[in-house]
Amino acid sequence: MINKTIPLFLIAGMLWSACQSNSKSIANSDSLEVQPQSETNSPGAGTEQETPLQTKGKIASAAEILARPQVPILCYHQIRNWTSSDGKVGKDYIVPTAEFKSQMKMLADSGFNTILPDQLYNYLAFGAKLPKKPIMLTFDDTKLDQWTVAVPELKKYGFKAVFFIMTVSLGRPNYLSKDQVKQMSDAGHVIGSHTYDHQNVKKYQGEDWVTQIEKPTKTLQDVTGKDIKYFAYPFGLWNKEAIPELKKRGFSSAFILAEKRDENDPLFTIRRIIASGYWNTKTLHNSIVKSF
């Protein structure tokens, strides 16, 4: 059994040291086109079309899913200015406020359209159409600046995002409250699970699945009044044993970081890249092009 209670400062340290980023190898391309096979005209830059999860029909094979062009998915953590106490590794996960705002403006000006997980699932599993230049924005770890900085900036451009919540943090200083999570959900953002306290899924045994997955999922369902269908692995770490555990608990898909997708279960190993605090808008562009 894993230890179920660890201080939040240790959680943060684990995150900074264990998450895997792609920030050191950026392509030099200036291209802005990242287009899966999608023909639906979007209603305008930055907006997504509300699409329910498709549950009927034959789901594509793993090979068919892997053959579809990948949609760029960005993973953010903290949106704030660096401080003297932030280490070199930690800064990779802290995007300065002005830079985040510039990145959102760049995405909007470039005609990117945010999509949500139901749309991505329908595209991967059933070949459903997507808007032009789709992109998904995700935020991990429940930090308060996601509410105070990110949400207003998303609203400015009509963007919607996915917030993966670590429920141990709800209501603590500098973290999101249940009411804020509820308001984000009501505004059209998607709330996903990020475990109870950010423990490594590869170490789960027995009751850990209840403590880290079932109870936090129930908490988020109670907060939002909605089913919780999407999961992000802490540190991006996963193993094959975790996938059936997530499936039997009702998840539709799960998200890793930049490593290769599983050839048998690509819906439960959807790739994301960390938006590094060291990147400007051009390097973010180039990383999107290179990574997807």
Residue ranges and their predicted role:
Residues 3-9:
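Sec-dependent signal peptide recognition
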Residues 15-18:
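C-terminal motif of bacterial Sec signal peptides marking the signal peptidase cleavage site
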Residues 20-22:
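Bacterial signal peptide processing site
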Residues 26-137, 144-145, 203-292:
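C-terminal active-site subregion of NodB/CE4 polysaccharide deacetylases
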Residues 137-138, 191:
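Residue-level marker for buried hydrophobic side chains located in beta-strands
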Residues 151-159, 176-193:
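Acidic (Asp/Glu)-rich catalytic clusters
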Residues 164, 194, 254-256:
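Short beta-strand and adjacent tight-turn residues that come in two discontinuous sequence segments
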Residues 192-205:
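Substrate-binding clefts and substrate-entry loops adjacent to catalytic sites
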